[in-house]
Amino acid sequence: VCSSDLNNPAELAKIYSSIDSIREDDNYRIARIKIVGYSSPEGNYDANARLSEQRAKALVQNLKHAYKLDDSMIECRSVPENWEGLAAWLREYCPSYMQKVLDIIGQTPEPDARDAKIKAIDGGKIYNALLREVYPKLRLVEYTVSYTVVPFSVEQGREIIKTRPDKMNHNEMYQVAVSYGKGSDEYNRIIDRKS
């Protein structure tokens, strides 16, 4: 799972790089890509719902174009206002106003009313600080790439264990070791490696 600001070419390059690292490895197959777009909580809820959906769909279109992905491989959704992200930031950094804002988030179910109550704290100073320092970080797209490991034969395993043993689990290593015969030098070397 990674987060990204799609307006930043460096972040988009990171997304491509993570997908490329899976696509270029013959041992993996991409099964699904999940995209979630978020907007920060300021402003009108309906407008934020549109923005978060647009963020998510923009990345979907970008990936579909770059990788010729089928619709069935992509799950796309959006979160209109990233209140969970704001609460997580508050808990992590513990500013003096943390509890006031957390109470508003927890006790005010209507998003636009939450926003108005936060604006009212300390004459808007806290809201303006959040707007400047925190809210930009809450406008993002998260993506998760799910993949499967392609099964390989014992012969392929013998090659993989020499060059990329980190790609093998203990059972696969054991199968390769047994293929050399219990007690053989190769068997012992592999068994010692996996311990």
Residue locations for each model-derived region?
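Periplasmic peptidoglycan-binding/anchoring modules of Gram-negative envelope and division proteins
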Residues: 4-36, 64, 172-176, 181-189
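Alpha-helical tetratricopeptide repeat
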Residues: 137-138, 155-156, 166-178, 188, ...
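Short, charged low-complexity linker/loop segments at the C-terminal edge of domains
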Residues: 147-160
